[in-house]
Each structure stands twice: as C-alpha cells, then as structure tokens.
Amino acid sequence: MIELCGLKKSFSGKLALNDINLFIQEGEIFGVIGKSGAGKSTLLRCINILEKPDEGEVIIDGQNLMSLSRKNLALARHKIAMIFQHFNLLNSKTVFDNIALPMRIQGIDEELIKQKIEELLPVVELTDKKDAFPSQLSGGQKQRVAIARALSCSPKVLLCDEATSALDPATTDAILSLLKKINELYGITIVLITHEMDVVKRICQRLSVMVDGKIVETTALSNIFNKPESLARKMLYAQISPELPTCLTRRLADYATEKPLVRLFFQGEEATVPFISQTSRELNMDINILLANIDRFDGVTCGVLVVELTANPLLLEAFINRCEQAGITVEVLGYVLPDGL
C-alpha cells in the first residue's frame, strides 16, 4: 500500500531522513515512534509530499508520487488525509462547514456533501454538534471534527501527526478507540506517529522505531517479546515495568547475596499460568513477589513481576534456566542487603 524507498531529506545541510525504506500494508494501523527530533514528522509529511524528499520514491497504491505532475499529485492527495496535534479548524465556521470544506474545494454537489456529513457525524459521535462552532467544543470534540473532515473525501490513507499529544488521558483513549473503529469500518490504512509507547501499544499492529533520522527497527507488536535486543521491546518494558521504590533500590548491591532481586517478563500463555507457585515448589525456594503489572499489546497478554528470591548462586541459576525454558525473560536487578546495611 505505502512503500518508501531510499528516502533522504535535509534541512540547511542537516540530514533529517537518512535512507528510509519502509513498507506499510493496506488496512493496517502502523506506528512510528521516536524521541523529539528523530524525524517522525518529516517522514510523515514526505508520505504525502508536503515535504518533498531530496532522494527516493514514495509509492502509494502502486503510484510513485515523486514522479507526478503538480496537477496529478493534487489528485493523488485526495486519497491521503491528515490530522495534526492542533486541530486547524476554522473558528468562524460550524462543525458542518468545517467538515464540508474539503468537499466544497473539490466541487462536490451540496446534496452529496450533506449526505456524507450525515454519515460521518454518528461515526465520530458528534450528531448533536452539527451547528456548533469550535469555541463551543472540547479538545476531544475538536479532534473528532478534524477526523471527520479528514474522512470526508473517502481517503485510503490517514496520516496522524501526534494527534493525541494535546489531549488528556481519557480523551486520548477515546480518540484512539475512534481511530481503531474507523480502521475497522472503512479499512483505511492509518500511519500514526508519536513519542508515546502507550499510544502505539493501544492500537497499532506494527511499528517502526526512529533514531536520528533512521529507522532502526520495524516489527509486529506481538513479536517484540521474541527479540531480546529489540529497542521497541525495551521501550515497552520501560512502560509496563513498575518503578522500584527508593526503600528497595538503596538496599541493592551488585555483589552476590542469597537474596537476588529479579525482574520477569511474561508473554502470551506464560502470563496466565501459575509459574511462580509451580517453580517455588519444584525448586523448594521462597519467591517473594514485590511488584507486578499486566497489560495487553495487540491482543497479546504481557506481564512483569519483580521478585525477591531466597537462593544461592546454584539455585539462582536453576531458577533462570527454568524461566528460559518457559519462555520468560529474566533480568537480575541486583542483590538485596539486609535492612539497615
């Protein structure tokens, strides 16, 4: 559906995109994540040639946008919609007129415009706001208007540039649920860029990680846990892993005692079996659960435990082997000293 081949883009001699190669499948929700300045927004704007790459090809639905005339590029963009962090609504226009704007620019008949808006308003849950002005709407409602406007010309691709970063957590959840519903309802390919892993894990099937203008990793969300060196996996782990309390970290040593502190990451079926109790019985060892969390990523259940073991080095090795056999990732965080030392 979307294929980027050898993209490069510079600003004032500084390379913003460096040899980007990426394929996004039709109908998927694809996330691009990275820190500020990684090149995410530039990449997104190159997909619809709002920023023209210095080198490379942008192929959408079999058509190379880089080779099109200005007129044909404008026509191709009709099928590529975009929403932003800021809603960019016309304050002097009603919700109806804001949604109608792209269709009126294309010269679509007013009766067809009315039909399309009447179709879209229930989808974005704004049926009762048709005649309201932006000043009368909440931030989430404004973004829903922007989404309806983006859908008005029946695009095949929806580009989302930090579309939830200006919203509170509850509204963010609602907008992400709406994007997922739109994907399922219309089969639109959604490309979403963000610096928040929580956004990616909520709705994306696959993701790319960007660092300094390069894509350093592309993976299915459900495969992250099978890649020990995955940067995306480390980002997910950091998000779901509970933070160790100060009262515990100040008692940690890097030399071996018989109280190793271990973090365990579970995935899929391993997250639902009574592994701790079984292992405690099999190895005849005490396992004290200190912290725990469980979450879901693209339908896959994942969990993290921080446990304190009562184990000498040989027993710790047996515990680690038992975890690895069960497909559980193990990280020894340190060794707990007696309180007061």
From Swiss-Prot:
Q: Where is the ABC transporter domain?
A: 2-237
Key word Zinc present in the record?
A: no
| Family annotation (PROSITE patterns) | ABC_TRANSPORTER_1, ABC_TRANSPORTER_2, METN
**Gene Ontology cellular component annotations, sorted alphabetically:** plasma membrane
Matches recorded under InterPro entries: AAA+_ATPase, ABC_transporter-like_ATP-bd, ABC_transporter-like_CS, ACT-like_dom_sf, MetN_ABC, MetN_ABC_transporter-like, NIL_domain, P-loop_NTPase
The entry's keywords:
Amino-acid transport, ATP-binding, Cell inner membrane, Cell membrane, Membrane, Nucleotide-binding, Translocase, Transport
Instruction: Supply the SMART domains for this chain.
Output: AAA, NIL
Pfam families named in the record: ABC_tran, NIL
Binding residues annotated for ATP, in chain numbering: 34-41
Q: Quote the catalytic activity from the record.
A: L-methionine(out) + ATP + H2O = L-methionine(in) + ADP + phosphate + H(+); D-methionine(out) + ATP + H2O = D-methionine(in) + ADP + phosphate + H(+)
The job of this chain, per UniProt, is described as: Part of the ABC transporter complex MetNIQ involved in methionine import. Responsible for energy coupling to the transport system.
Protein's name in the database = Methionine import ATP-binding protein MetN
- What gene name is given for the protein in this entry? metN
